[in-house]
């Protein structure tokens, strides 16, 4: 993994005030009310968020509300796994920790509005 990506991941974890973890190609962190998965893909980062204790979700409603302008034009993939609603994006190569942080905040806000998280 590229040193710059490693440093950006460390900075993202600090910005989100998450517990320190060993940086690797795939990181999954659970800190209520959200789950976060970071996957390094070449020089890019796949950032995925979900509510840990989602009471229910409406995939159709989430898909309707998933508008590009909500995420500054960055396409989001909305999907479910075992009744959990996830939102995921492959970040552009030039994104840094602060841009990842803002995207993560937007994903969390989106999920909270749908599912009643914080």
Predicted segment positions?
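Short, internal acidic amphipathic alpha-helical interface segments
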Residues: 48-83
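Short, Φ-rich (hydrophobic/aromatic) sequence segments
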Residues: 12, 59-65, 102-109
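Charge-rich, low-complexity N-terminal segments
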Residues: 1-35, 68-80
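Ordered, soluble secondary-structure elements with a strong preference for glycine-centered loop motifs
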Residues: 3, 57, 97-101
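The feature represents the first ordered module of a protein
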Residues: 28-59
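A generic structural signal for beta-strand entry/edge sites
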Residues: 24-26, 42-46, 82-86
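Well-ordered alpha/beta subsegment
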Residues: 82-105, 109-118
């Amino acid at each position: 993994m590229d040193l710059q990506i490693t440093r950006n991941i460390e900075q993202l974890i600090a910005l989100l005030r998450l517990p320190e973890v060993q940086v690797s190609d795939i990181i999954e962190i659970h800190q209520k009310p959200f789950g976060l998965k970071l996957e390094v893909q070449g020089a890019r980062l796949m950032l995925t968020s979900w509510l840990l204790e989602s009471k229910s979700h409406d995939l159709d409603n989430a898909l309707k509300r998933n508008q590009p302008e909500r995420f500054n034009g960055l396409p989001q993939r909305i999907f479910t796994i075992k009744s959990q609603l996830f939102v995921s994006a492959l970040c552009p190569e030039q994104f840094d920790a602060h841009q990842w942080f803002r995207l993560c905040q937007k994903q969390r806000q989106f999920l909270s509005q749908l599912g009643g998280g914080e």
